[in-house]
A protein has these predicted regions:
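Short gly/pro-enriched beta-turn/loop segments at secondary-structure junctions
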Residues: 72, 77-81
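Alpha-helical scaffold segments that mediate packing/assembly in large oligomeric complexes
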Residues: 1-6, 10-70, 122
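A glycine-rich phosphate-binding loop feature that marks nucleotide/adenosyl-phosphate handling sites
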Residues: 29-33, 80-87
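Sequence/fold signature of self-assembling virion shell proteins
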Residues: 42-53, 57-68, 82-83, 89-205
């Protein structure tokens, strides 16, 4: 009985994990999108030139990429940063960056206000192990800053008929003990806009 009741939950979890991996694979693979240019590219103004670990300076640089974005007519849209997506290993560092109120700044002095402290309740840090796995051992692991989708989108997951959980059908086959399970879920992942996300190529961890 326990197995029968657990099966739907197990498959739902597996489906979500698969979708999650496919989303991050797009971020890692950096494919060409609707305009024929890679998702992250200098032409899109959403790519940091040299990779580095998250720091106050590198996080500010990625956030500014979003804030400097413009619409197709060249008007500023100032995409508000909302998510910082980092591989496992940077979560503690991000806590230090956002939760430290006072820092030492060269040319200004010690006990200087941390400009990012005000974002501690505005930015959501997502520490994702799929980035580590997909980047591969010994390789630089990128990290990302994504904006509020009210201003600009980035990747979008769509489900057939809006069904976000697997459909499960259980049946019995005559002459055979046990059950037959039909379990399915239809989805698609699209990079709908480059303006809603910025990439730092990162470094090895």
């Amino acid at each position: 009985v326990g197995f029968i009741t657990e099966v739907p939950g197990l498959y739902a979890t597996s489906a979500k994990r698969t979708i999650n991996k496919q989303v991050y694979k797009i971020l890692i693979d950096n494919p060409a999108i609707f305009d024929g240019v890679s998702l992250f590219d200098n032409a899109h103004n959403n790519l940091i030139a040299s990779g580095a670990a998250p720091s106050i300076d590198t996080l500010q640089a990625a956030m500014l990429k979003l804030l400097h974005q413009t619409d197709p007519f060249g008007d500023s849209i100032m995409v508000e940063p909302k998510y910082v997506i980092v591989p496992v290993g940077y979560g503690f560092k991000m806590s230090q960056i956002l939760e430290t109120a006072m820092i030492d700044v060269t040319g200004i002095g010690s006990h200087t206000a941390n400009a990012l402290y005000q974002y501690r309740n505005k930015l959501q840090v997502i520490e994702e192990g799929a980035l580590n796995v997909l980047a591969g051992s010994g390789n630089a692991i990128p990290w990302f800053v994504a904006g509020d989708q009210r201003y600009a989108k980035s990747l979008q997951v769509d489900y057939l008929n809006g069904q976000e959980t697997p459909t499960i059908r259980r049946s019995e086959v005559p002459g055979r003990l046990g059950f037959v399970w039909d379990i399915w879920l239809d989805w698609g992942i699209t990079a709908v806009d480059f303006r809603g996300i910025a990439k730092n190529p990162g470094t090895t961890i």
